[in-house]
Amino acid sequence: MANIKSAKKRVKQTVVRNERNTAQRSMLRTAVKKVIKALSIKDIAGAETAFAVAQPILDRFSSRGLIHKNKAARHKSRLTARIKALKTA
């Protein structure tokens, strides 16, 4: 356990940030899963609306450093490709 006052404060900050990041990462995963679920049942409209919700979440969290920018780009690219493939099929 920390003895110095500033170290105690840092421990508190770490706990708060960890909880916030965990919740936000969970929200991100849920948004992506909704798109994938809509794609699996071949619901084009549902997939597009879910993707419209997930895309800004990916952008926001990548700019904050919660996920890497390449991971966000990869998710967006792959989901877009799957939606496009479903439309043409």
UniProtKB/Swiss-Prot annotation:
Entry keyword Signal: no
Ranges annotated as biased composition (Basic residues): 1-12
InterPro entries per the UniProt record, alphabetical: Ribosomal_bS20, Ribosomal_bS20_sf
Listed GO CC annotations: cytosol; small ribosomal subunit
Region annotation Disordered: where it falls in the sequence: 1-20
Assigned keywords, A-Z: Ribonucleoprotein, Ribosomal protein, RNA-binding, rRNA-binding
Listed GO MF terms: small ribosomal subunit rRNA binding; structural constituent of ribosome
Signal peptide boundaries: none
One matching Pfam family: Ribosomal_S20p
GO terms under biological process: translation
Domain of life where this protein originates: Bacteria
Cited HAMAP family: Ribosomal_bS20
Function description: Binds directly to 16S ribosomal RNA.
UniProt cross-references to NCBIfam families, sorted A to Z: S20
Family designation: Belongs to the bacterial ribosomal protein bS20 family.
Protein name: Small ribosomal subunit protein bS20
Lineage: Bacteria, Pseudomonadati, Pseudomonadota, Gammaproteobacteria, Lysobacterales
Encoding gene (name): rpsT
